[in-house]
């Protein structure tokens, strides 16, 4: 009986909250409609023109990004190409990979998805064997590593899968949240609420730039099978 009463009470509380939310949405819509009704023709025309300008600007920005190679996950052939790619785009994610490292292939799949969703960010990959100078300069020692660059400068790193839950089964949303935490893409969710089911399991300690040290030219693998 007590359990049934608790469920009934919870249902009533939930119903009340839904009604309150619906009421607030309706009030907001009514307010917006009232504002439109009170506008004269000139004001409506200015509002229409303002929105058209915003749409044109957004379309121009999209075309500019696409012309610079955004919207797809691309491999660059050498470290020389890296500098030009980074120079022309505000936000860049570069995956430093190695063919023999299994976890790099896992990242490839998620990055390909995000590249199409986030046109504001350029997504690249570079084989570490073809970029020894760059890897030393950026302190790339663990494979895979994502270098996150803003305005041509390295802002953060995602080293291995530590920040992604130390599991091969992390979701694309988890990687998206991690990149959003570094302001390298436009994240629409709440950064204070990571898409983890178990926060204690996954943790929240990110790999910071200042912790990187050069220990030689051998690359460590984050994959168990490598």
Curated annotation (Swiss-Prot):
CDD domains: Phd_like_TxnDC9
Modified residues (Phosphoserine): 188, 221, 223
Annotated keywords: Cytoplasm, Cytoskeleton, Nucleus, Phosphoprotein
Record has Methyltransferase as a keyword: no
Assembly and binders: Forms ternary complexes with the chaperonin TCP1 complex, spanning the cylindrical chaperonin cavity and contacting at least 2 subunits.
Native source species: Homo sapiens
Function: Significantly diminishes the chaperonin TCP1 complex ATPase activity, thus negatively impacts protein folding, including that of actin or tubulin.
PANTHER family per record: THIOREDOXIN DOMAIN-CONTAINING PROTEIN 9
Single GO term (MF): cadherin binding
A GO BP entry: microtubule cytoskeleton organization
Gene3D superfamilies documented for this protein: Glutaredoxin
Gene Ontology CC: centrosome; cytoplasm; cytosol; midbody; nucleus
Domain of life: Eukaryota
Protein name stated in the entry: Thioredoxin domain-containing protein 9
InterPro entries, sorted: Thioredoxin-like_sf, Thioredoxin_domain
Disulphide bonds in the chain: none
Subcellular locations according to the entry: Cytoplasm; Nucleus; Cytoplasm, Cytoskeleton, Microtubule organizing center, Centrosome; Midbody
Thioredoxin domain location: 74-180
């Amino acid at each position: 009986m007590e359990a049934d009463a608790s469920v009934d009470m919870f249902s009533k509380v939930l119903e009340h909250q839904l009604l309150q939310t619906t009421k607030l949405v309706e009030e907001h819509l009514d307010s917006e409609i009232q504002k439109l009704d009170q506008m004269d023709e000139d004001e409506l025309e200015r509002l229409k023109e303002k929105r058209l300008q915003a749409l044109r600007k957004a379309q121009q920005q999209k075309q500019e990004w696409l012309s610079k190679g955004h919207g797809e996950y691309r491999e660059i052939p050498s470290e020389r190409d890296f500098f030009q790619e980074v120079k022309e785009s505000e936000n860049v994610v570069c995956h430093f990979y190695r063919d023999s490292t299994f976890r790099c292939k896992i990242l490839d799949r998620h990055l390909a998805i995000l590249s199409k969703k986030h046109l504001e960010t350029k997504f690249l990959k570079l084989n570490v064997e073809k970029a020894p100078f760059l890897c030393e300069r950026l302190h790339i020692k663990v494979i895979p590593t994502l270098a996150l660059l803003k305005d041509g400068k390295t802002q953060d790193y995602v080293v291995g899968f530590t920040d992604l839950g130390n599991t091969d089964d992390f979701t694309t949303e988890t990687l998206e949240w991690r990149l959003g935490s570094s302001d390298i893409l436009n994240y629409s969710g709440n950064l204070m609420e990571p898409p983890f089911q178990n926060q204690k399991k996954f943790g929240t300690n990110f790999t910071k730039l200042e912790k990187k040290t050069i220990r030689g030219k051998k690359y460590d693998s984050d994959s168990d099978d490598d």
